[in-house]
């Protein structure tokens, strides 16, 4: 469904922006098995879109290039978010038709499902006229998944713990970027299992960062600790980084547990040209030129 069509057909719409891990440091592991992370996160202008409309009975419909992959999944995060919020608000939660325009690859390291869940919480709160306390929303979001609280914010941030400790980063600038994914699945549990070390150095960012060049230097000196084991599972990840570098990317890195990689470029024109070249070489991959949001939004 085109963007204009979604806005016309549904009274409330929400963007589910792609989540980009500019840095992901694995710094430890809790007794319950969850890994401790320190992440610098931003969000892209591209992503999924959702529409919400009052209905006689609950309905869920799909469109978009990756929508068919979710068909028949009655336990996806959108429906879980709807049901969880309904339990919280009770009788005020009338039946709703939710439409998901699935533009992002499934399980690709850029928070698609988590962003959809967060957008569902935001959209249904608007549709149902709800205004829940921040701590209640944070608890609901974390119940849905470790990435959902940061996707609910959808702005540049540092996340720690398992992702629930969030600190805004108002000085992070916008970046011209290319996202690329070979459309091969990566098992997140297997990536963590293959980690060579689980107590890696913490993420350190100077408090005085302001210029874009300073941020690029800081991001360049950071890392994604999940990238080496993910490359063992999907060698195309390393290939993507090499191809982005060949197109002039200033920084390349994998996002999340993969397999999406990003390249930061000096201008949006350079990013668009690189995306076109990459798509020409690998038309079977997901390739998207985009711009990330700034901390000032």
UniProtKB/Swiss-Prot annotation:
EC numbers, comma separated: 2.7.1.148
Pathway: Isoprenoid biosynthesis; isopentenyl diphosphate biosynthesis via DXP pathway; isopentenyl diphosphate from 1-deoxy-D-xylulose 5-phosphate: step 3/6
SUPFAM superfamilies per UniProt: GHMP Kinase, C-terminal domain, Ribosomal protein S5 domain 2-like
Keywords (A to Z) from UniProt: ATP-binding, Isoprene biosynthesis, Kinase, Nucleotide-binding, Transferase
One GO-annotated biological process of the protein: isopentenyl diphosphate biosynthetic process, methylerythritol 4-phosphate pathway
Binding site residues for ATP: 105-115
Keyword Cytoplasm applies: no
Reaction(s) the record says it catalyses: 4-CDP-2-C-methyl-D-erythritol + ATP = 4-CDP-2-C-methyl-D-erythritol 2-phosphate + ADP + H(+)
InterPro entries in UniProt: GHMP_kinase_C_dom, GHMP_kinase_C_sf, GHMP_kinase_N_dom, IspE, Ribosomal_Su5_D2-typ_SF, Ribsml_uS5_D2-typ_fold_subgr
A GO molecular-function descriptor: ATP binding
Active site per the UniProt annotation: 19, 147
HAMAP family assigned: IspE
Function as written in the Swiss-Prot or TrEMBL entry: Catalyzes the phosphorylation of the position 2 hydroxy group of 4-diphosphocytidyl-2C-methyl-D-erythritol.
Family classification: Belongs to the GHMP kinase family. IspE subfamily.
Name the UniProt record assigns to this protein: 4-diphosphocytidyl-2-C-methyl-D-erythritol kinase
Name of the gene encoding the protein in the UniProt record: ispE
């Amino acid at each position: 469904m085109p963007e204009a069509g979604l806005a016309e057909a549904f009274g409330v719409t929400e963007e589910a922006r792609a989540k980009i891990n500019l840095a992901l440091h694995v710094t430890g592991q809790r007794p319950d098995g969850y890994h401790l992370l320190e992440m610098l996160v931003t969000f892209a202008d591209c992503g999924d879109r959702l529409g919400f409309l009052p209905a006689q009975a609950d309905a869920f419909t799909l469109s978009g290039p990756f929508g068919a992959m979710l068909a028949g999944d009655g336990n996806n995060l959108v429906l879980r978010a709807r049901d969880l919020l309904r339990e919280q608000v009770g009788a005020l939660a009338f039946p709703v038709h939710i439409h998901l325009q699935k533009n992002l690859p499934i399980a690709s390291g850029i928070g698609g499902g988590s962003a959809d869940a967060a957008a569902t919480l935001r959209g249904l709160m608007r549709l149902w006229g709800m205004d829940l306390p921040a701590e209640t929303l944070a608890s609901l979001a974390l119940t849905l998944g470790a990435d959902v609280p940061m996707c609910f914010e959808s702005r540049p941030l540092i996340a720690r713990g398992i992702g629930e400790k969030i600190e805004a980063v108002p000085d992070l600038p916008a970046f011209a970027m290319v996202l690329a994914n070979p459309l091969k699945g990566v098992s997140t549990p297997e990536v963590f299992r293959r980690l060579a070390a689980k107590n890696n150095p913490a993420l350190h960012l100077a408090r005085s960062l302001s210029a874009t060049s300073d941020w690029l230097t800081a991001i360049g000196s950071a890392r994604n600790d999940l990238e080496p084991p993910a490359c063992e599972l999907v060698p195309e990840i390393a290939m993507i980084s090499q191809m982005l570098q060949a197109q002039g990317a200033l920084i390349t890195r994998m996002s999340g547990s993969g397999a999406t990689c990003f390249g930061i470029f000096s201008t949006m024109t350079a990013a668009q040209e690189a995306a076109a070249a990459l798509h020409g070489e690998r038309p079977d991959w997901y390739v998207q030129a985009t711009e990330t949001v700034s901390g000032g939004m």
